[in-house]
Design a protein with these regions (language model features):
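Glycine-rich phosphate/adenosyl-contacting loop at the front of the ribokinase-like
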Residues: 1-57, 65-67
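General beta-strand structural signal in soluble alpha/beta enzymes
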Residues: 5, 81, 132-133, 160-164, ...
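Cofactor-binding loop segments of dinucleotide-utilizing enzymes, especially the Rossmann-like FAD-
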Residues: 5-9, 59-62, 84, 136, ...
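Short glycine-rich anion-binding loops that position phosphate/pyrophosphate groups of nucleotides
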Residues: 8-10, 98-100, 106-108, 136-139, ...
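Conserved N-terminal subdomain of the carbohydrate kinase-like
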Residues: 23-25, 49-129
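Hydrophobic alpha-helical segments and helix pairs
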Residues: 109-153, 159
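Conserved phosphate/ATP/ADP-binding segment of small-molecule kinases
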Residues: 143-205
Length: 205
């Protein structure tokens, strides 16, 4: 089975304007949508479209979390989220006008006991499973949280895929993840130099 983890899921509220955004004024939208997401959830969505089952893990909170969970179920995604007692799953406001403006929510605090619940869900993974860690983390979690999960799974043969930036990505490298997905800039951060040409990128990879 493929398991995806999204530490900070979101409901993206997308508002479209047919005129430039005027700060401090009333702006009338010409259209709006709600998109359920977060990198790991997006991966599960693509897998579902390809006919490949997965389980979306992560954290949800409050009415927005319940709404996100129902929406994903309606899309045919299987979820097994940890439910937080406090806070709310974040809402990101995306204003699409002449220029795009984003207001991204912070997300709920994740206490240690909730993180432990997620770890327990991963304890059953074996060499037949794939774990995909993708995206940013809330400020309440330590920067070594990805490393902590891979260390817990070390030696079990679980194929781990990591799509993250900076310390989140660098800290997992000693555990030899099956696949990492840095872009050019993120790869440059790992090797400690700027990469400009295809040859430089290939050598760094």
């Amino acid at each position: 089975m493929i398991y995806t983890v999204t530490f900070n899921p979101a409901i993206d509220y997308v508002v479209r304007l047919d005129a430039p955004l005027e700060v401090g004024q009333v702006n009338r939208a010409c259209g709006e949508d709600c998109v359920l997401g977060g990198k790991g959830i997006n991966v599960s969505g693509v897998l579902a479209q390809l006919g490949c089952p997965s389980v979306a893990l992560g954290f949800v909170a409050g009415e927005t979390g319940a709404w996100l969970e129902r929406g994903l179920a309606a899309q045919g995604l299987h979820t097994d989220f940890v439910h937080l007692e406090n806070g709310m799953t974040r809402i990101n406001v995306k204003i699409k006008a002449a220029q795009e403006t984003e207001l991204n929510g912070a997300g709920p605090d994740i206490p240690d006991e909730a993180l432990h619940q997620l770890e327990e869900k991963l304890d059953s993974l074996t060499e037949n499973d794939v774990l995909i860690l993708a995206g940013s983390i809330p400020a309440s979690l330590p920067q070594d949280v990805y490393e902590r999960l891979l260390a817990r799974l070390d030696g079990r043969g679980v194929r781990c895929v990591v799509d993250a930036t900076r310390a989140l990505l660098v800290n997992v490298l000693p555990y030899h993840p099956f696949l990492i997905k840095p872009n050019n800039h993120e790869l440059g951060e790992i090797v400690g130099r700027e990469l400009h040409t295809d040859e430089e990128i290939a050598a760094a990879a």
